[in-house]
């Protein structure tokens, strides 16, 4: 199994840099190593242990056929989250969180279907029969839907888990997941409340290098879970054939 986490790699990526001590959340105390120049330093041995713990759970979730929805709308996280989530074929939200994304999933699915129906209109020629004004309106709607929901177009049911970068910023996503008992995995910085999260990864959630490093471990574990599922399906098919 992969994911041998080197403390030096975490250090080089700046995963240990927390926030100013005056901005801290006291509930993060167990994960703080020390204070240096008015900044809290995260205990990377605890980070490594928490990554392993989270990865073990993530492998099981994806091996059972469920999706992990990645959520990160802050500037320094958007691109890396989109890239990493896409690499393991998982849905992600990097634009504004659509209110009711989880708690009103049926409505969100309708919006995604609207996107598909516009694409169908373009394929079957219906689009060409519309007036110039109607075409423009539909194109604008399609662009808006694509921007906000394009990355979750293949998510036909609620996710098995959420992976969040910065729980303070994504507090609405956190609340919706809690309401539906969907497990929350998150990078939690020293200014955030770890009590809201099922699988806490104490880490610098402001630097893109730190975010990329944590996500590389997480997506590697997801890949392993997917590979395990593929080989299980293959074995099942072989057994069925033999019978």
Set out the residue ranges of the language-model regions.
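N-terminal cationic and glycine-rich segments that engage phosphates or anionic surfaces
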Residues: 1-67, 73-74, 78-121, 132-135, ...
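Residue-level signature of catalytic and energy-coupling elements of molecular machines
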Residues: 14, 70, 162, 214
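Short beta-strand elements at the ligand-binding edges of bilobed clamshell
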Residues: 46, 197-208
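Short hydrophobic alpha-helical runs that function as membrane-insertion/retention elements
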Residues: 68-69, 91-94, 183-187, 222
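Conserved nucleotide-binding/hydrolysis micro-motifs of P-loop NTPases
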Residues: 74-77, 97-102, 168-170, 190-194, ...
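Active-site rim loops that border cofactor/substrate pockets in soluble metabolic enzymes
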Residues: 119-161
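Nucleotide-binding motor/catalytic cores of P-loop/tubulin-like NTPases across gene-expression machines
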Residues: 168-201
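A charged, well-structured terminal subsegment
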Residues: 212-237
């Amino acid at each position: 199994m992969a994911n041998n986490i080197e403390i030096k790699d975490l250090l080089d990526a700046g995963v240990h840099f927390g926030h100013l001590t005056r901005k801290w959340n006291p509930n993060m105390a167990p994960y703080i190593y020390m204070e240096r120049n008015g900044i809290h330093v995260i205990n990377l041995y605890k980070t490594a242990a928490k990554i392993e713990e989270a990865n073990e759970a993530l492998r099981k979730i994806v091996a059972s056929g469920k999706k992990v929805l990645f959520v990160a709308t802050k500037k320094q996280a958007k691109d890396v989250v989109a890239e990493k989530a896409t690499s393991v074929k998982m849905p992600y939200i990097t634009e504004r969180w659509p209110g009711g994304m989880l708690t009103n999933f049926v409505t969100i699915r309708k919006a995604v279907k609207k996107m598909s129906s516009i694409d169908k209109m373009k394929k079957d020629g219906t689009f060409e029969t519309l007036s110039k004004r109607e075409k423009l309106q539909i194109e604008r709607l399609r662009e808006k839907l694509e921007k906000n929901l394009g990355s979750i177009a293949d998510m036909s049911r609620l996710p098995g888990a959420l992976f969040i970068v910065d729980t303070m910023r994504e507090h609405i996503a956190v609340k919706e997941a809690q309401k539906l008992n969907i497990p929350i995995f998150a990078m939690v910085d020293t200014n955030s409340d770890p009590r809201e999260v099922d699988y806490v990864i104490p880490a610098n959630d402001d630097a893109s290098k730190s975010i990329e490093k944590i996500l590389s471990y997480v997506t590697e574990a997801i890949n392993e879970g997917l590979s395990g599922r593929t080989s299980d399906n293959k074995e099942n098919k072989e057994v069925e054939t033999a019978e």
